[in-house]
């Protein structure tokens, strides 16, 4: 595809182009076009990110059916906060948040037959990133958190950011010696951010990887998690559920300790705490074990998850990515909710769309099922537009998220270049 033009298609639409011209009455030419027409960029890389992923994000936002004011608010946030944090274009720094190793991921969360919620996850980049000044990218994320705090975002709270970075992130001197002694040619970021766009508001989440702190301290990642949670138990009230999860991991998944965890950047008494697990064992038996914590929980509607497993034909082949899941723990909740992440990056978009349609029909989301293949028309026609499908089945309902390649102009064989910061 010509990188000088970007075309994205959506349900019953025309197109958004780099000039902003389109035929879709639903999105109108007022959002992305308005910002693109008179936008001033600090660098050519910012302009290219905006014309590529910025235009793609505009389409995602339009799918959430927010009104025009909400779309403006969200796009302004993307333009002013996210785009400057993406670094060089095309991207040159490897990131482990998705299968493309690009430091951004886009997703849609479907919570029923209504409109989905849009999310962006990013590994922020600055001139310090990956250098001896900030080898694990901690200072860059800290600076972005400071900027977010100054913006007066509704509900934004840095308390848990300060707590968990203090518990898990090393000092600058320790980071430098860690990079030298670890023998790693390049250090991956230790912490990243994600943003949910809901009704014109932005909800921020933070993730921290555990292995750097574990290696530097000589302590097991689970010991560090237990200690960190115990110090905020009077606010988060989640230690019982955390202990339940860690005991399961130590019994059934001991070869791969908790690789990372996340929380909401809100008041600690309202924040969820999520613990992630990874296994290279792709089988329904493993998935059932994960969902029941090795038999300790009676998972709500496990048979429904098994049907999704078969719809995705996960017994017929092994994905190239590991089987991933998380346990979501809410304040005061004695037991976690389980979310499975099923790799679909090895499938064609057509295969994935057919599976999603079948899944949505099974859930009774008939209109959403009928429209999903059409919503994919705006995505570039590659073999890997989709990366993951995640699902939670709880008493409140079924939550399904689909994750996508972040470059609207990306080609099938896009690879991170072998030069680094």
UniProtKB/Swiss-Prot annotation:
Substrate binds at residues 119, 272, 274, 276, 341. Pathway: Secondary metabolite biosynthesis; Alkaloid biosynthesis; Mycotoxin biosynthesis. PANTHER family: INDOLE PRENYLTRANSFERASE TDIB-RELATED, PRENYLTRANSFERASE ASQH2-RELATED. Belongs to the tryptophan dimethylallyltransferase family. This is Prenyltransferase asqH2. The gene is asqH2. It is an enzyme of class 2 (transferase). One of its GO terms (biological process) is alkaloid metabolic process. One of its GO terms (molecular function) is transferase activity, transferring alkyl or aryl (other than methyl) groups. L-tryptophan binds at residue 105. It comes from Emericella nidulans (strain FGSC A4 / ATCC 38163 / CBS 112.46 / NRRL 194 / M139) (Aspergillus nidulans). The keyword Membrane does not apply. The keyword Cytoplasm does not apply. Keywords: Transferase.
